[in-house]
Every structure is written in structure tokens, then in C-alpha cells.
Amino acid sequence: MNYELLTTENAPVKMWTKGVPVEADARQQLINTAKMPFIFKHIAVMPDVHLGKGSTIGSVIPTKGAIIPAAVGVDIGCGMNALRTALTAADLPENLAELRQAIETAVPHGRTTGRCKRDKGAWENPPVNVDAKWAELEAGYQWLTQKYPRFLNTNNYKHLGTLGTGNHFIEICLDESDQVWIMLHSGSRGIGNAIGTYFIDLAQKEMQETLETLPSRDLAYFMEGTEYFDDYLKAVAWAQLFASLNRDAMMENVVTALQSVMQKTVKQPQTLAMEEINCHHNYVQKELHFGEEIYVTRKGAVSARAGQYGIIPGSMGAKSFIVRGLGNEESFCSCSHGAGRVMSRTKAKKLFSVEDQIRATAHVECRKDAEVIDEIPMAYKDIDAVMAAQSDLVEVIYTLRQVVCVKG
């Protein structure tokens, strides 16, 4: 048995956390969630677990007959995309700053501060590939905004194919054989945040009379068979599609940027299914487990069915992994979505300096300023320990090291 069993007054919690730290607040948050009467069998916890807003990051929450919107959160469909290119390290330019600049030009990122009307994190004039992907989203958007007009006043179309901020990133990486990979991390951007926030608030309002009886107000839920349950599932499915297409559009534009800098073909003919991977790690969907159809919420966790490829990034100074799932049913066929934080962003900014950031990322062409100190590698768990703790969930196919990193 490779997991720790945490017993509660209701469902148990199975934690793949051997050799990695788990803060007491995260344990209590997991216990609170496990108290809910509709938890199916047990909660599974990944080794990158840490305290989260709404629910615990690195948790897999299986439910029957209900869904907790705050467990999915506001970064709906957040996930990873990775592409193995036809390039090798020898093809990369000596000046990697030029490459980083080309990517930053190709993909809007960051957020506007102050009184500037221009949103630097959005497109002014979206390119053709964004238009094509928006066409796949338009029917769902029409339903969403007709039923909930509040979503008309959101960043949607102009956020498609954009990176965002925080821990979202685009990286150029090398594997063990010096093959070049493109890897990126983003979600459903402004519209997903708006959908998540609205339905979390709505669930709490709907349960206003009984809210105080819950272990936490963040555990407010929609019951299956109600209108809001159905609407939430439909809205979340749309946001998850937005997130997937968002990553696809960014990947296409990064490939184009690399080709313009290097004057070489970047994308090789696809011969293996795993050569391009696009996976969510913040989402909910219906799945079959232990012979029953249930709703699985992965909050900072990746699907790892037998033979399924996934992406587990480290921090901006640590290695990352392309993995293949082992289909461990006890984890609801899941694995970690990264290394996991060992401290809050606020604490990291107080504890570390720009000089620390420069030293920790000396081998990476990336931002090294005060605004990204909260993403310093030391703010995250040891990725090797995280991988060791989930050796029965996934097998490593490629180990990547980054050479260029773009942050919002």
C-alpha cells in the first residue's frame, strides 16, 4: 500500500504523500470535504497537495448526486499542453533572449495595472486561428449568455489564445536526448473565472438556510436533478473546452514564433499519439469507477488511466515530466499536476529576494524580477520526492529541463 489512510467520521482519505510534507491546514480541509454525505468511497490525495481556496489543491473528489462548485474553483479547465518538436538543442539560437521575446510577442500575457485602458493580457485584434477556435465555442457561448446575461460583460473571445498570470507559463524544454519540447500552462481565463465565481456564490445562496451546518461554506453544493446542477455542468463543460482550445491556440502561435526566429520546421509529422498532449488538471466530469457512474472533480490532479499520457511540471527552475498513467483505481486513475507549493505566495515574497531568484534560475532564460519571486523554485516541493510518492500511479516517459520560461 503506497498511500497513507486518513480516517474521518464519514469517507476515508487516501493520501499518496510518502516523503512529502502536508500542512495541517490542508489535512483539516480534506477532512472537512470527506464529511460530505455524497462522497463516493474515498477522497484521493496527490503528493503535490497543499491548502487551497475552496478546496485542497491536489485532491480528487468523487461524488454521487451532487457537485461542489468551489472544489472545481474559478480556474476551470486549467491544464497543460506539451509538444515534442523536430528540433534539437543544437538548433536553438545562442541568444535565447531572442526566442523568449518572440514568444512574448506571439502570446498576450500578464495583466494591465493602473489606469491604462489597454488590456495587455488580451488580444486587440485576434489572429485567424483564434477566430477558428472561437467558432467551436460560439454556440455554447450563445446559450450561456442568453440564460445568464451577466457573462456578456466578461473577457472571452479576446482572451482565447492568451496566457494569463500567476503560475501560468510557456516553456521551451529539452528532454534527455536534447530534443526540444514546447510546454505551456493555462486555463479558461476571464470567462472561466466569471463562471466559477458566479456558481460558487449561487450555490452558497441556494443553501443559505443550511449553510452554517456545513463544515465550511466552500462546501456548498448543487444536487443532481436541479436546474442549477444541470446549468453548472453545462457551463463548466463549455469553460473546459475554452481552456483546451486556448492552449491549442497558444501552442500554434508559439510554434509559428519559433519558426520565424529559427527558420526551421518546428512541428514534425505526428507518428505517436503522445507527441502532443493537452490535459486538464482543474475540472469535473462524469466517469466510471468501481462499476458506478460518478462525478470526479480533480482539483490540481491529472487523469492517469492505463496508457494515458500526462504532464507533471516542476517549478520554473526544476525538471518536469511527461508520464504515462498506470490506471490505479484507488486514486480514481489520477496523478499529481505538479510539484505543489510548500509556502504561500505572500511568504515567498517575504522570504526570498531577486538575487535568490537570479541564482535559482541561472540556467533558464526568464524573468528575474520582484513580480515573479512568488514563483521561485524554493516555494515548491521537491519534484523528485513528489514523483517517488506516486510511482504506482504513473511511469515517467520523458524528463524535461527548461531553457526558456515565459511568465505572465
Swiss-Prot record:
Record-linked InterPro entries: RtcB, RtcB-like, RtcB-like_sf
UniProt keywords, alphabetically: GTP-binding, Ligase, Manganese, Metal-binding, Nucleotide-binding, RNA repair
Keyword Manganese (UniProt): yes
Cofactor needs: Mn(2+)
Binding site residues for GMP: 167-171, 281-282, 313-316, 320, 337-340, 407
Annotated binding of Mn(2+) 1, by residue: D75, C78, H168
Binding sites annotated in the UniProt record for Mn(2+) 2: C78, H185, H281
EC number: 6.5.1.8
GO MF annotation, one: DNA ligase activity
Its biological purpose: GTP-dependent RNA ligase that is involved in RNA repair. Joins RNA with 2',3'-cyclic-phosphate or 3'-phosphate ends to RNA with 5'-hydroxy ends. GTP-dependent RNA ligase that is involved in tRNA repair. Repairs broken tRNA(Asp) and tRNA(Arg) that have been cleaved by colicin E5 or colicin D, respectively. Does not repair damaged 16S rRNA in 30S ribosomal subunits.
Record note on quaternary structure: Monomer.
PANTHER family attached to this UniProt entry: RNA-SPLICING LIGASE RTCB (PTHR43749:SF2)
This protein's name: RNA-splicing ligase RtcB1
Protein species of origin: Escherichia coli (strain ATCC 25922 / DSM 1103 / LMG 8223 / NCIMB 12210 / NCTC 12241 / WDCM 00013 / Seattle 1946)
